[in-house]
């Protein structure tokens, strides 16, 4: 059986797509969609991707009107949470460390739920030279 090899895109409706794309770029480092096919789009690091339908009545996403939630892998959850909070974002850090890693939650400017995940065996952040 032929199988898909990964997720090629995440498409969703937005009230102000340009503003929302800027927010994702400025806050999370996701490059906007290129304006021509000769340029490269955002490329994610290799790693696990969880694909999981949830029961319709789940409370996991928060607001019941939201039918989806995206989970982004991060290398250093504490650094990402600090960066987002410094930019004025309300981020809820889950105090519990789970067998598969650590998590935090926030919403984008249009109220879409976002989960940040630092996998348990996440590689260390790259060294910086100051």
Model feature map: region roles:
Residues 1-5, 11-50:
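Core segments of cupin and vicinal oxygen chelate
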């Amino acid at each position: 059986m032929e199988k898909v090899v990964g997720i090629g895109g995440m498409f969703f409706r937005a009230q102000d797509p340009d503003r929302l794309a800027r927010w994702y770029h400025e806050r999370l480092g996701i490059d906007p969609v290129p304006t021509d096919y000769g340029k490269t789009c955002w490329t994610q690091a290799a790693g696990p991707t969880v694909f999981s339908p949830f029961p319709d009545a789940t409370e996991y996403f928060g607001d019941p009107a939201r039918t989806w939630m995206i989970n982004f892998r991060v290398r250093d959850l504490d650094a990402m949470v600090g960066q987002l909070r410094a930019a004025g974002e309300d981020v809820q850090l889950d105090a519990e460390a789970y067998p598969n890693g650590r998590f935090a939650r926030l919403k984008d400017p249009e109220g879409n739920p976002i989960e940040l995940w630092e996998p348990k065996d996440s590689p260390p952040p790259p060294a910086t030279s100051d």
